[in-house]
């Protein structure tokens, strides 16, 4: 599996990950940026999560943040923790449908580092995809939100899906999984990663471009009010 090594200040990806659903040399950029791109971004994000942020650029454990930065980081991560604390995996919600009070929830504090990585990874990959479109069109890179959105809008439509839609569909596809109920409950207790569906739905609902991609509005299942959406970086 891919990983980040804080003391060495490096990230690692085994060659075996460079295959579908993460990467396909025959696929278009949207699919690959939504797949391996988000994974690469995830590992970069670990450098600035609740643990990685304690190490400096040389891999030394050092307090290098300002008090203001720490306070803002704490505020944003707390909001993300609270979001995930409210999640119950759908298979367990179904299992405990007769008594929802017994349904186990995601542990937002346990999974915060991985959730920060996932959220950062998607946003990094979206920006990288936009820059790839800019390069192909001979446009200068512009990292502003407005320019990113404009660049992504130039992606070709394929099989009836826009570039943005293909990006998010690819991201969702890399987390497809199926577990027994017993294992799903065990993972909630010990795994620092959120359940696969939460790594998908819990993340994209915080990304403004997801709403534009699928025309999500208030009242839709995936809707999260703009003021409640979290952006760590």
Mark where each language-model region is.
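Catalytic glutamate of the conserved HExxH
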Residues: 39, 43, 47
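Zinc-dependent metallohydrolase catalytic domains
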Residues: 2-35, 47-233
